[in-house]
């Protein structure tokens, strides 16, 4: 792989808790400011726009590009799902049951958005028109966290406190699959081109591969304290992830080869991660910056 060039873009203040990031087809990066109570947009020309949210403490967290090409995001404290149009027009969809604390969100093969309810022990599904369905999980206190669309047509999710992953669809009941390590504390999840799922295990500092046959392979990182958090797949077969506890961005190939890239400033606290249409990797740093990683020719 070519050398990696890292560039940082200031988009917020440290006290605003920059958290999630997503790319839309127009090349823009959208991000959440969990304590700034706003959604931001970094345009391809470098301009930064902010869209304040109506709740005083909505806590926008995870964000994704929906099937309609627009950014969709969860508001954990406001108990809602939000959607923004390119011109900043906002729509909010409150969840049917209070204090569900939605967190992870991802587009599904069915043209809907699926989200995890941390405190509700449920997975939710919302159409682009705002119709919501909820599905109870068979595990209580599992802390459903992040979502990903699998190549098998199912939606997959992590259960942070249960040390497990699960699958679901609108017609298939939820199934739960324990991971190999009791202290895994899985957070991020992504699917590769071969149909395998890759899981960021924050608890034991490892990336796990869950293949189509249900086999689990664990790849320990350089430190158990690395606390891998979010993970995303690129078109070249690599999985990129944030190491919240180690101040790095990590990469693992489908063969299990690991690499890591140190961030410029100590204590950057990387959280969300996304791949843009050009194949560049973007991560959200709690210091109020987005960092872009792109391949550069060798010297």
Curated annotation (Swiss-Prot):
Enzyme Commission designation: 4.2.99.-
GO biological process, one term: response to antibiotic
Key words of the record: Antibiotic resistance, Lyase, Magnesium, Metal-binding
Active-site annotation: 271 (proton acceptor)
A Gene Ontology term for the protein's cellular component: outer membrane-bounded periplasmic space
Positions with a binding annotation for substrate: 229
Cofactor(s) needed by this chain: Mg(2+)
Pfam families named in the record: Vgb_lyase
Coiled-coil residue spans: none
Residue positions binding Mg(2+): 269, 286
Alphabetized InterPro entries for the sequence: Streptogrm_lyase, Vgb, WD40/YVTN_repeat-like_dom_sf
Annotated GO MF terms: carbon-oxygen lyase activity; magnesium ion binding
Role according to the record: Inactivates the type B streptogramin antibiotics by linearizing the lactone ring at the ester linkage, generating a free phenylglycine carboxylate and converting the threonyl moiety into 2-amino-butenoic acid.
UniProt similarity note: Belongs to the Vgb family.
Subunit (UniProt): Monomer.
HAMAP family reported in the protein's UniProt record: VirginiamycinB_lyase
Stated name of the protein: Virginiamycin B lyase
């Amino acid at each position: 792989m070519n050398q990696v060039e890292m560039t940082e873009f200031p988009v917020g203040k440290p006290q605003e808790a920059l958290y999630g990031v997503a790319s839309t087809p127009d090349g823009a990066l959208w991000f959440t400011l969990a304590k700034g109570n706003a959604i931001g947009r970094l345009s391809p020309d470098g301009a930064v726009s902010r869209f304040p949210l109506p709740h005083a403490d909505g806590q926008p967290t995870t964000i994704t590009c929906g099937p309609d090409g627009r950014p969709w995001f969860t508001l954990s404290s406001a108990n809602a799902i939000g959607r923004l149009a390119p011109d900043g027009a906002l729509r909010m969809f409150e969840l049917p049951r209070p204090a569900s604390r939605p967190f992870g969100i991802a587009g599904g093969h069915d043209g809907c958005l699926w989200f995890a309810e941390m405190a509700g022990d449920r997975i939710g599904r919302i159409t682009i028109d705002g119709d919501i369905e909820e599905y109870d999980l068979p595990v209580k206190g599992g802390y459903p966290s992040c979502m990903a669309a699998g190549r098998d047509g199912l939606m997959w999710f992590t259960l942070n406190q249960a040390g497990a992953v699960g699958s679901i669809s609108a017609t298939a009941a939820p199934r739960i699959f324990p991971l190999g390590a009791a202290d895994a504390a899985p957070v991020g999840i992504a699917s590769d081109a071969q149909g395998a799922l890759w899981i960021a295990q924050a608890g034991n500092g490892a990336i796990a591969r869950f293949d189509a046959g249900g086999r689990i392979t664990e790849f320990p990182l350089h430190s158990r304290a690395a606390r891998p958090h979010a993970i995303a797949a690129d078109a070249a077969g690599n999985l990129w992830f944030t190491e919240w506890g180690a101040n790095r961005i990590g990469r693992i190939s489908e063969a299990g080869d690991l690499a890591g890239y140190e961030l410029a400033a100590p204590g950057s606290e990387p959280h969300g991660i996304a791949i843009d249409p050009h194949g560049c990797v973007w991560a959200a740093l709690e210091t109020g910056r987005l960092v872009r990683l792109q391949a550069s020719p060798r010297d």
